[in-house]
């Protein structure tokens, strides 16, 4: 059995997830448990929808994660936005726990409106620490790296600093690496040794043990473009570097999600399977 355990993104309704996993031959998935474009209880799955997913996955060895709101900004200069960000993530964690997901992944926020990125990072660290203290037991947040504009957490060093400074245990606060974001932020993943270099960078920063999952996306744009434009594995500027990451021994036991349409993900899974960077179960 070679390569990472890779799966797909599936939009609600949640009841469709068990069947789609069977259809695509995978056991890993990402979904959302509310409207990602708004704060508040919009698009929260109905109890019957949740129950159908849970029942459909009963007895199956699946791994799933929810993606938090795209509006999350724990570094916002506005207290209203910071508080809404915390409330949104807490609500997502509650639903995720109720339906058996591994946790919630999220982007920490932006430096915009602060005198320096360091000031924004300090505020985000404080709010993230407060959030972790309020998390329900048995739930987990996964900090995802970013790549655009004034977003925080664009480098391995910066996400590592956040994780260290918050100081939460790995089972409460882990790391999710998006390969497209990392490449777009300037960490070149297009070479055959991409997996070695990434594992080395994470180990050097002391966060390899916090790594919980991947968004295994290729990139439409060159390294360092600082734009989030996903491509199907093997069809972008990372190319075989995606396989180098997915097949690396340090990552091969982790789950990975292709953040693409099901049709595009199907091609990506075929590419990874062909080159030894994927297994479904």
Residues covered by each model-derived region:
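Acidic/histidine-rich catalytic cores of soluble enzymes
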Residues: 29, 130-231
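N-terminal pre-domain/capping segments
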Residues: 1-68, 72-91, 281
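C-terminal active-site-proximal or functional interface alpha/beta core segments in diverse enzymes
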Residues: 135, 262-266
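Acidic (Asp/Glu)-rich catalytic clusters
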Residues: 19-26, 44-65, 92-100, 131-137, ...
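Hydrophobic faces of well-ordered beta-strands that scaffold small-molecule active sites
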Residues: 4-10, 29-31, 64-68, 104-106, ...
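Short, electropositive alpha-helical surface patch
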Residues: 80-93, 116-129, 155-165, 194-200, ...
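Active-site beta-loop-alpha junctions enriched in small/polar residues
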Residues: 7-13, 34-36, 69-71, 109-111, ...
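Active-site acidic/histidine proton-transfer and metal-coordination neighborhood
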Residues: 74-174
């Amino acid at each position: 059995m070679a390569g990472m355990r890779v799966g797909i993104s599936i939009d609600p309704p949640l009841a469709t997830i068990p069947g789609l996993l069977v259809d695509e031959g995978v056991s890993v998935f990402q979904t959302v448990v509310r409207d990602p474009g708004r704060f508040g209880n919009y698009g929260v799955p109905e109890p019957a929808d949740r129950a159908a997913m849970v029942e459909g996955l009963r007895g199956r060895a699946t791994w799933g994660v929810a993606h938090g709101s795209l509006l999350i900004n724990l570094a916002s200069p506005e207290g209203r936005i910071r508080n809404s960000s915390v409330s949104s993530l807490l609500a997502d964690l509650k639903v995720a726990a109720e339906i058996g997901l591994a946790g919630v992944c999220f982007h920490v926020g932006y430096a915009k409106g602060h005198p320096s990125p360091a000031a924004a990072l300090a505020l985000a660290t404080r709010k993230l620490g407060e959030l972790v203290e309020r998390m329900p037991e048995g739930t987990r947040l996964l900090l995802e790296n970013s790549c655009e504009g004034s977003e925080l957490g664009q480098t391995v060093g910066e996400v590592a600093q956040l994780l260290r400074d918050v100081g939460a245990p790995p089972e409460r606060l882990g790391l999710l690496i998006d390969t497209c974001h990392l490449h777009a932020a300037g960490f070149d993943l297009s070479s055959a040794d991409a997996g070695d270099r990434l594992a080395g960078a994470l180990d050097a920063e002391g966060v390899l043990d916090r790594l919980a999952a991947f968004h295994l996306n290729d990139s439409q744009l060159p390294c360092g473009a600082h734009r989030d434009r996903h491509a199907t594995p093997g069809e972008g500027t990372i190319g075989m570097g995606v396989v180098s990451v997915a097949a690396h021994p340090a990552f091969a036991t982790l789950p990975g999600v292709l953040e693409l349409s099901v049709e595009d993900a199907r091609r990506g899974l075929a590419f990874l399977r062909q080159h030894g960077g994927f297994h479904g179960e």
